[in-house]
Amino acid sequence: MGTPDFAVGTLKELIDNQYDVVAVVTQPDKPKGRSKELVFSPVKEEAVKNNIQVLQPERARDEAFVEELRKYNADVFVVVAFGQLLPKSIIDMPRLGCINVHASLLPKYRGASPIQWAVIDGCEYSGVTTMKMDEGLDTGDILLVDKVKLDKKETGGSLFDRLSIVGA
């Protein structure tokens, strides 16, 4: 489950390492520009290139979506910047649980925009935390932390690029 470029590296790694990625969940296509042409999320683009089923719920809590997801009988869900909170019914669904890859050194900068806040606040370090998800917002048991030192000239864009590689 993921949406922006930050999540694409993780999806590619899963595919390249021969994991059986049977479906991808991403945000619905969004209209862009004056023509309001629908644009795929970066994660959907990668999934389509790899012939992976794509699910795009308006709301992750919708019962029809939850039931559709249940049909996959997944061992694990990997969540990277999906953009919606998952209900307990989804978190508890896979046999091995849900793993979240978050772009901060948790517990600092839970939720949205952690990369930008690390730069705005002038942090000396940032990183990527991999955790087992629970019902809270980025509050699950921490499994792995990858720490990186920020450059004095670090921008949100440069840190995004660095952390997306680390997170993959």
Residue ranges and their predicted role:
Residues 27, 31-73:
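N-terminal glycine-/serine-/threonine-rich beta1-alpha1-beta2 phosphate-ribose binding loop
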Residues 20, 51-53, 97:
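Conserved beta-strand segments of alpha/beta enzyme cores
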Residues 23, 56, 143-144:
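A structural microfeature
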Residues 1-34:
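N-terminal Rossmann-like dinucleotide-binding module
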Residues 3-6, 58-61, 82-85:
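Short beta->alpha connector loops
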Residues 17, 27, 76-168:
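Donor/substrate-binding cores of folate-linked one-carbon enzymes
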Residues 8, 12-16, 66-70, 88:
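Amphipathic, non-transmembrane alpha-helical secondary structure
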